[in-house]
Each structure stands twice: as structure tokens, then as C-alpha cells.
Amino acid sequence: IHLSGEVGEMNREAIKVFREMGIGRIIFHRKNTVVLMRQMIEAVNAEKLEFEAFALNELCQFTGAFCNSLHCDEMGYLCRTTYWGDAEMEERMERVIKRTLEIEEQQEQQYLCGKSGCALCALPQLEAAGITHLKLVGRGNYVEDMIRDIWNLKAALGILEGDQREEKETGRYIDQLNKKIFDGQPCGNNCIYNPGQFL
């Protein structure tokens, strides 16, 4: 039995209870830090448990069960819906909406790995924390983008597997990620886990 990250609050005692209930895998919620995940895993001495963390897509912690608009086909995300009041504001909003739609149209044509949430740079830390499985979110994504996400995650895992421990710590892993996944361009800076928390 796999326990969804949508269960919300997770702590050492909760993991112990779920282990006693026969849960085989704990999926950590996006809001947990790598440090917290490590502490929980170490505290329960969980030899028979598997642990899963988010690796790509959907940075927002409310995207799953806690989003009131995601599963409604008739409307988009409420947090991305524009609102306006008076006539002057309406004119400004129309210009903003037009520009936003133009930018979104351009962005839809440009694939960027992890543009809605990424933890590829945190893979060595997730591994060291005891994470045994990774979650790649696919809901709401284009099939072509999902295929590229899968290839990129596999490539990142290949880089990680090929690196020696010392090289990961000196940043060689990040350099290779930038070259192989991001083609030398900067990443989207949409880190699921705070980039400074595990340094």
C-alpha cells in the first residue's frame, strides 16, 4: 500500500503509525524539506519502508487534492484567474491579459524541463536522505512534454549513478545537469526544495 502525499501533515509518529498499518511506501508532500524527510526516515529506522519524493513538475503544494479548481474541466486554475474592478483597471487588465497570453503562447512552444517545479539538483540530497522513489507529476501536461520529462529524469539519474560521491559534493553533478538537461542555459529556478537548504 502506498500512502499519498496528499495525506498532508507528516511526522515521525505518523510514519510509525502508518508502518504498523502495513503501509509499504510513504510519499512525502511537496512542502517537506530534504532535511525534514531525512530526519523522519532516520527516526523511524524504516528498513522495510519505501520513501518517495517529488522530482519534476507542479511546484504548488495545493496542486493535488487541496486545489479547488484543478479537477474542474470548465475552468482553469483559480490562482491564475485575473480579476478587475473599475473601468481604468479593466483597460490595464486587458493589456496585461493580452501580453500574458502572448507570453504563455511563446512559453508553450518552448519546452523547459521543470518549468512548473523541479528537484533535479536535489537528487543527490534526496538519495542521501533515504528517498527510494521519485515522483514525476504528469497531470495537466502535454504528452510531448511528459516524454521529455521522463527522458530528462532518466538522464539525471544516469548522471547521478555515474558520479562519484566526492564529485557530487563539488558540483560536478550540477555542471553535468546544466550541460545535458538544460543545454547550458539556466534552469527555470522553480525549485521544489529550497536550493540553499541542503548545502
Region spans (language model):
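Active-site pocket-lining/capping segments in soluble small-molecule metabolic enzymes
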Residues: I1-E9, E13, M21, I27-L199
